[in-house]
Amino acid sequence: MTTASPSQVRQNYHQDSEAAINRQINLELYASYVYLSMSCYFDRDDVALKNFAKYFLHQSHEEREHAEKLMKLQNQRGGRIFLQDIKKPDRDDWESGLNAMRCALHLEKSVNQSLLELHKLATDKNDPHLCDFIETHYLNEQVKSIKELGDHVTNLRKMGAPESGMAEYLFDKHTLGHGDES
């Protein structure tokens, strides 16, 4: 492994922050990978919930964009990107829409906790640029995602999922599909 050359643009950017950004990049890519797995599961012919598939594919793209935004920040601040292996999702069979939404909720809470820890590190290292970046691009979006997923879990449960297959079909069609006829 070659050592990265020192940056001429680096200023007030602590090595701990740089390392934490690299870990966050990996976590965002892992989240993207999990959502991609969920999307493919719901797109299977024996599951056939196309709006669950679309929803999770959209989430996958969002998480990848989060990782790319962090990579751009790393380069702007004079840090160096060191990519790690992306962990395989814990499962391939997501069982039901309700289970996938519960797993997604847990995942988003984990990502949010990691971002909060990154923000605390930036505060401790007196890095207002990093604090502002996290606040502007991530924290509010995470709270909205967690609320949306929590609502989806509640609504699926109220409709009788996972015992009622009709509940997931109707949720797929009318909530995730926004009532579309396609």
Swiss-Prot record:
Enzyme Commission number, as recorded: 1.16.3.1
Pfam family of the protein (one): Ferritin
- EC top class, as a word: oxidoreductase
- Per UniProt, residues of the Ferritin-like diiron domain are 11-160
CDD domains per UniProt: Euk_Ferritin
Keyword Phosphoprotein carried by entry: no
Query: In terms of domain of life, where is this protein from?
Result: Eukaryota
Residue sites binding Fe cation 2 per the record:
E63, E108, Q142
Catalytic activity field: 4 Fe(2+) + O2 + 4 H(+) = 4 Fe(3+) + 2 H2O
Note whether Metal-binding occurs among the keywords: yes
Extract the InterPro entries matched here.
Answer: Ferritin, Ferritin-like, Ferritin-like_diiron, Ferritin-like_SF, Ferritin_CS, Ferritin_DPS_dom
- The positions annotated for binding Fe cation 1 are E28, E63, H66
Q: Which residues carry this modification: N-acetylmethionine?
A: M1
Under the cellular component aspect of Gene Ontology, which terms does the record hold? autolysosome; autophagosome; cytoplasm; cytoplasmic vesicle; cytosol; membrane
Record text on subunit structure and interactions? Oligomer of 24 subunits. There are two types of subunits: L (light) chain and H (heavy) chain. The major chain can be light or heavy, depending on the species and tissue type. The functional molecule forms a roughly spherical shell with a diameter of 12 nm and contains a central cavity into which the insoluble mineral iron core is deposited. Interacts with NCOA4; NCOA4 promotes targeting of the iron-binding ferritin complex to autolysosomes following starvation or iron depletion.
Role of this protein: Stores iron in a soluble, non-toxic, readily available form. Important for iron homeostasis. Has ferroxidase activity. Iron is taken up in the ferrous form and deposited as ferric hydroxides after oxidation. Also plays a role in delivery of iron to cells. Mediates iron uptake in capsule cells of the developing kidney. Delivery to lysosomes is mediated by the cargo receptor NCOA4 for autophagic degradation and release of iron.
The family note in this entry says: Belongs to the ferritin family.
Record protein name field: Ferritin heavy chain
Q: Which organism is it from?
A: Rattus norvegicus (Rat)
Gene that encodes the chain: Fth1
